[in-house]
């Protein structure tokens, strides 16, 4: 249990969006709040969560818990991506490509938060279509999980890394 707590504390947490939503009932409207968060270790692990509650802090806490339970591992290359990649979820499309050292994170909104917590320091990225934060986060994570390192490609093809890079 102590090791699990230690692991959870060294994660970077970012709140992307808080939204007030309502349910209409016979007596009027019932308001509640939703929160979208991402957590990452800055070294290739990332998770996202979406929580809903009657109060904002409770919604944020729920989404953070879901994000910690829903972690993915991304193959990074010294603070950038191995190759250009596209991601798509419903109406949101994202394109990300590696950038040279010193470029920084050139991305907007929800995509920037995802790239910061996962540990990408240099990337060029663009979101097309719907900019709904939930869909952009999902599209970005789908794109990042499809990144393959040269070692992964070599293992899959049964070749050496040198043979692939020629």
From Swiss-Prot:
Family in the record: Belongs to the universal ribosomal protein uS5 family.
NCBIfam families reported for this sequence: rpsE_bact
Subunit relationships: Part of the 30S ribosomal subunit. Contacts proteins S4 and S8.
Gene3D superfamilies from the UniProt entry: 3.30.160.20, 3.30.230.10
Keyword annotations from UniProtKB, A to Z: Ribonucleoprotein, Ribosomal protein, RNA-binding, rRNA-binding
InterPro entries: Ribosomal_Su5_D2-typ_SF (IPR020568), Ribosomal_uS5 (IPR000851), Ribosomal_uS5_bac-type (IPR005712), Ribosomal_uS5_C (IPR005324), Ribosomal_uS5_N (IPR013810), Ribosomal_uS5_N_CS (IPR018192), Ribsml_uS5_D2-typ_fold_subgr (IPR014721)
One Gene Ontology term from the biological process aspect of the record: translation
Superkingdom of origin: Bacteria
Pfam families documented for this protein: Ribosomal_S5, Ribosomal_S5_C
UniProt remark on domains: The N-terminal domain interacts with the head of the 30S subunit; the C-terminal domain interacts with the body and contacts protein S4. The interaction surface between S4 and S5 is involved in control of translational fidelity.
Residues annotated as domain S5 DRBM: 11-74
GO MF annotation terms: rRNA binding; structural constituent of ribosome
Lineage, broadest ranks: Bacteria, Pseudomonadati, Pseudomonadota, Gammaproteobacteria, Vibrionales
Gene: rpsE
Role, per record: With S4 and S12 plays an important role in translational accuracy. Located at the back of the 30S subunit body where it stabilizes the conformation of the head with respect to the body.
GO CC terms of this entry: small ribosomal subunit
Protein name stated in the entry: Small ribosomal subunit protein uS5
